[in-house]
C-alpha cells in the first residue's frame, strides 16, 4: 500500500498568530524569521562553503514553510562568488497546501528578493503526491528537490552527495522523531567528506548519534540571546560505507554524443545543454522525430495501482517531471501543441473499475492529480453512453511528440550540432574518448560521453548480450473531420481516441509484437475501429471505405520487464570475467562502460519517461542529487539484466 500524504494544517489564533500542529507557532516578525534562517546558513559555513564550486548540495530534514530555503536562495543570489548550480533537497512528511503555504510565507517576506522568490516557489509548488518533486528556479541554477514522505524512508531512498545539512527540530507526534539515530545514519550515508551541519536540537541522543556516525559536534553562541546552535562536520575516523555518495563523471571536456533524435534523445540534449555541455546529436533519418516520435499525437498519463508498484511510481514521477519541463520550455518561448482539457482512462469492465477505485482510494491523491468518475459522471463528461466509469487526469492529455523534440532542440541552441541522415556503424573507445564511426570507418564525432537513445539499435551499438529489446508494431488510424461525434478530451481504455486540432480523430493503436512490416493494413484500421466503437459507443458514425483511411505505422521497442533502460551501461565483458565474485552483487557494485549511457526501451511511454530519463542521466553525469528514489533508479538501471544473469548462475 502507498504511504498517503497527510498535509500540514494552518490556523490563526485569536491573537493573530498563525499556528500549525506540525510546526507550532509561526514567527510573526519577518526580520526574526530571516535572522533565524540565516543562523542556519552561517552554522554550515555558508556562503563561503559554496564559493568556487560547480555544484553545491544542501539537504534539509524538514521543509516546513520554506523559510530556510528562501533565505538560502536569497544569500546565493546576493553572492557574486556563488556556486554555478545550487541543489536544495528537503524532506517533508507533511507539506502545506499551496494556499496555507502562501499564508505561512507571508510572515517571512521582508524584502523584494524574498518576495520574488516566495512567489516563484508558490507558483511551482507541486501536487500532494508522495515521491520526489524537482523544481527549478533562476534558469535552472537553483534546484529544489522536495521529498514528500516519511523522513527516514525518503532519506534511505535518496541518492545524493550532501555538502551541508540543515537539521530541523520537528519532534512532534505528527512528524515523529525526524532526528532519530536511523535518520542520522541515513544522513551519514550521503554526506560528503567535510559536509557541515547545523541544528537547534540539543538532545543528548541526537548528539550521540551524530558522533557515532562520524560527525563532530560543538555549540556556537551568537551573543544575541538566542539558544546556542549545534554545528559540526562529517569527519569519520574510519570508513563505514560500502558505497560512497555519487560523484561527477571525470571528463576532459563537457562534450557528449547523443545517438537518436526522438523523444529520448532530444530530452537528453536539452538537459545536458542546460548544464553547459556541448552535444553532437546524430540521427539516421533526415528529420528529427521520424520513428514513433513522429506520430501526430501521443497520449500522456500516469499509471495507478493499489500497491503503488514500480510502474506506478515511475510513471507518476515521469508524468509530473514532464509537466514541469514542458512548462519551462513554454515559458522560455518554445511552445508546442498539447491538449489542455485533461484525459479520461475508462475502465474496460466492472472489475476493472473496482481496481481503479481501489488504487484511487489507496493513494488518496488530490483532485489536481486524479479524480474518480462513476459511470454517470463519465457519460456526462464525454457526452457518450459509455459502459463504465474511470479516472480523470486533469493534466493528462495528448501531446505532439515532434513538437516536444523541436522545442528541446531549440532550447539547446548553439550547444547542439545535429548530424541528420547519418548512420553510426559502430562505437570505438580510444583512451578516454568515444568515437562514433560510419560504415566507411570515417569518424563522425568524438566525446568522452555517449548516450544511446536510438531504441532498438542501441543494443547493437553497445554490444549488449544481456539486454533484450522487442519491436512492437503499432498502426494508428486517422478518421476525417465530420465523421465522428465531438470528443471533449483524449480518452483511453482498450484502445484510445484523440481529437486533433483540425477535427481529425486519431484512434489506435494495434499491438503486434515482433512484426516489423511498415505496410499500412486494412485489418489494422478495422481493429482500431472495433476497439474504439466498443470503448466509446456513438462516437464513430458512417465512414467512407476503410481502405481509403489514412494512418501511420511506427515501432515501439519494449524490454521484457516493461521498464525503460536509463543510466550508465554495464561493462558486460568485465562483469562476465568476474562472475563468481559478482554473483551476490548489487547494481552499484557492477563495473560500468566508462562514459556510455542508455536511454531506450521506452515502449509506448516515451512522453512520460523521456524528460525524467534525461534528467536522471544528466544528474548522474554531474554527480547531482538524483530525481528518483534509489529503488526506482535500480529499476531502470541498464545493469539489472546482467545482475539477474549473475544471480541466476547463467554466466560464469
Curated annotation (Swiss-Prot):
Pfam families: DAO, Methyltransf_30. One of its GO terms (cellular component) is cytoplasm. Its cofactor is FAD. It is found in: Cytoplasm. Keywords: Cytoplasm, FAD, Flavoprotein, Methyltransferase, Multifunctional enzyme, Oxidoreductase, S-adenosyl-L-methionine, Transferase, tRNA processing. It catalyses: 5-aminomethyl-2-thiouridine(34) in tRNA + S-adenosyl-L-methionine = 5-methylaminomethyl-2-thiouridine(34) in tRNA + S-adenosyl-L-homocysteine + H(+). One of its GO terms (biological process) is tRNA wobble base modification. Residues 259-652 are annotated as: FAD-dependent cmnm(5)s(2)U34 oxidoreductase. Residues 1-235 are annotated as: tRNA (mnm(5)s(2)U34)-methyltransferase. GO terms for molecular function: flavin adenine dinucleotide binding; oxidoreductase activity, acting on the CH-NH group of donors; tRNA (5-methylaminomethyl-2-thiouridylate)(34)-methyltransferase activity. Its EC number is 2.1.1.61, 1.5.-.-. In the N-terminal section; belongs to the methyltransferase superfamily. tRNA (mnm(5)s(2)U34)-methyltransferase family. Catalyzes the last two steps in the biosynthesis of 5-methylaminomethyl-2-thiouridine (mnm(5)s(2)U) at the wobble position (U34) in tRNA. Catalyzes the FAD-dependent demodification of cmnm(5)s(2)U34 to nm(5)s(2)U34, followed by the transfer of a methyl group from S-adenosyl-L-methionine to nm(5)s(2)U34, to form mnm(5)s(2)U34. This is tRNA 5-methylaminomethyl-2-thiouridine biosynthesis bifunctional protein MnmC. It comes from Burkholderia ambifaria (strain MC40-6).
Amino acid at each position: 500500500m502507498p504511504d498517503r500524504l497527510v498535509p500540514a494544517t494552518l490556523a490563526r489564533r485569536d491573537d493573530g498568530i498563525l499556528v500549525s500542529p506540525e510546526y507550532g507557532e509561526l514567527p510573526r516578525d519577518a526580520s526574526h524569521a530571516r535572522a533565524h534562517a540565516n543562523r542556519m546558513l552561517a552554522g554550515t559555513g555558508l556562503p563561503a562553503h559554496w564559493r568556487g564550486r560547480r555544484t553545491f548540495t544542501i539537504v534539509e530534514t524538514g521543509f516546513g514553510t520554506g523559510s530556510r530555503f528562501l533565505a538560502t536562495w536569497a544569500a546565493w543570489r546576493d553572492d557574486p562568488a556563488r556556486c554555478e548550480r545550487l541543489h536544495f533537497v528537503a524532506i517533508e512528511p507533511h507539506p502545506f497546501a499551496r494556499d496555507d503555504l502562501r499564508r505561512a510565507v507571508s510572515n517571512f517576506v521582508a524584502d523584494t528578493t524574498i518576495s520574488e522568490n516566495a512567489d516563484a516557489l508558490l507558483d511551482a509548488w507541486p501536487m500532494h503526491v508522495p515521491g520526489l518533486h524537482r523544481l527549478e528556479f533562476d534558469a535552472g541554477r537553483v534546484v529544489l528537490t522536495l521529498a514528500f514522505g516519511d523522513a527516514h524512508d525518503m532519506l534511505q531512498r535518496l541518492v545524493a552527495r550532501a555538502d551541508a545539512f540543515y537539521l530541523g527540530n520537528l519532534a512532534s507526534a505528527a512528524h515523529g522523531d525526524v532526528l532519530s539515530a536511523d535518520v542520522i545514519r541515513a544522513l551519514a550515508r550521503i554526506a560528503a567528506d567535510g559536509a557541515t551541519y547545523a541544528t537547534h536540537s540539543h538532545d543528548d541522543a541526537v548528539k550521540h548519534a551524530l558522533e557515532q556516525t562520524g560527525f563532530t559536534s560543538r555549540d556556537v553562541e551568537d551573543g544575541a540571546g538566542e539558544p546556542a546552535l549545534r554545528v559540526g562536520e562529517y569527519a569519520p575516523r574510519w570508513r563505514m560505507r560500502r558505497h560512497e555518495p555519487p560523484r561527477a563523471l571525470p571528463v576532459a571536456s563537457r562534450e557528449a554524443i547523443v545517438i537518436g533524435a526522438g523523444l529520448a534523445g532530444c530530452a537528453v540534449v536539452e538537459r545536458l545543454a542546460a548544464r553547459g555541455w556541448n552535444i553532437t546529436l546524430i540521427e539516421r533519418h533526415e528529420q528529427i522525430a521520424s520513428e514513433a516520435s513522429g506520430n501526430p499525437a501521443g497520449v500522456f498519463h500516469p499509471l495507478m495501482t493499489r500497491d503503488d508498484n514500480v510502474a506506478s511510481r515511475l510513471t507518476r514521477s515521469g508524468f509530473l517531471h514532464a509537466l514541469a519541463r514542458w512548462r519551462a520550455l513554454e515559458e522560455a518561448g518554445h511552445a508546442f501543441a498539447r491538449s489542455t482539457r485533461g484525459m479520461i482512462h475508462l475502465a474496460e469492465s466492472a472489475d476493472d473499475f473496482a481496481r481503479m477505485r481501489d488504487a484511487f482510494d489507496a493513494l488518496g491523491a488530490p483532485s489536481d492529480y486524479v479524480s474518480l468518475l462513476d459511470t454517470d459522471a463519465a457519460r456526462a463528461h464525454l457526452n457518450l453512453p459509455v459502459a463504465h466509469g474511470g479516472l480523470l487526469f486533469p493534466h493528462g492529455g495528448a501531446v505532439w511528440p515532434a513538437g516536444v523534440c523541436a522545442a528541446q532542440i531549440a532550447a539547446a541552441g548553439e550547444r547542439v550540432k545535429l548530424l541528420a541522415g547519418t548512420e553510426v556503424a559502430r562505437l570505438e573507445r580510444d583512451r578516454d574518448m568515444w568515437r562514433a564511426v560510419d560504415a566507411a570507418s570515417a569518424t563522425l564525432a568524438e566525446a568522452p560521453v555517449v548516450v544511446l537513445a536510438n531504441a532498438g539499435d542501441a543494443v547493437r551499438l553497445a554490444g549488449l548480450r544481456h539486454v533484450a529489446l522487442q519491436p512492437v508494431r503499432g498502426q494508428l488510424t486517422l478518421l476525417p473531420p465530420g465523421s465522428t461525434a465531438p470528443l471533449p478530451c483524449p480518452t483511453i481504455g482498450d484502445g484510445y481516441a484523440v481529437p486533433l486540432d483540425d477535427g481529425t480523430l486519431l484512434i489506435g493503436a494495434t499491438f503486434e509484437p515482433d512484426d516489423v512490416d511498415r505496410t499500412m493494413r486494412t485489418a489494422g484500421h478495422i481493429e482500431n475501429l472495433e476497439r474504439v466503437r466498443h470503448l466509446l459507443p456513438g462516437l464513430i458514425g458512417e465512414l467512407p471505405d476503410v481502405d481509403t483511411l489514412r494512418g501511420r505505422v511506427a515501432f515501439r521497442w519494449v524490454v521484457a520487464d516493461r521498464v525503460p533502460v536509463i543510466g550508465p551501461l554495464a561493462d558486460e565483458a568485465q562483469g562476465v570475467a568476474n562472475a563468481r565474485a559478482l554473483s551476490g552483487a548489487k547494481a552499484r557494485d557492477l563495473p560500468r562502460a566508462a562514459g556510455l549511457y542508455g536511454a531506450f526501451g521506452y515502449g509506448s511511454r516515451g512522453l512520460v519517461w523521456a524528460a525524467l530519463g534525461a534528467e536522471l542521466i544528466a544528474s548522474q553525469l554531474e554527480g547531482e542529487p538524483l530525481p528518483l528514489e534509489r529503488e526506482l533508479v535500480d529499476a531502470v538501471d541498464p545493469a539489472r539484466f546482467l545482475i539477474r544473469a549473475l544471480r541466476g548462475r547463467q554466466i560464469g
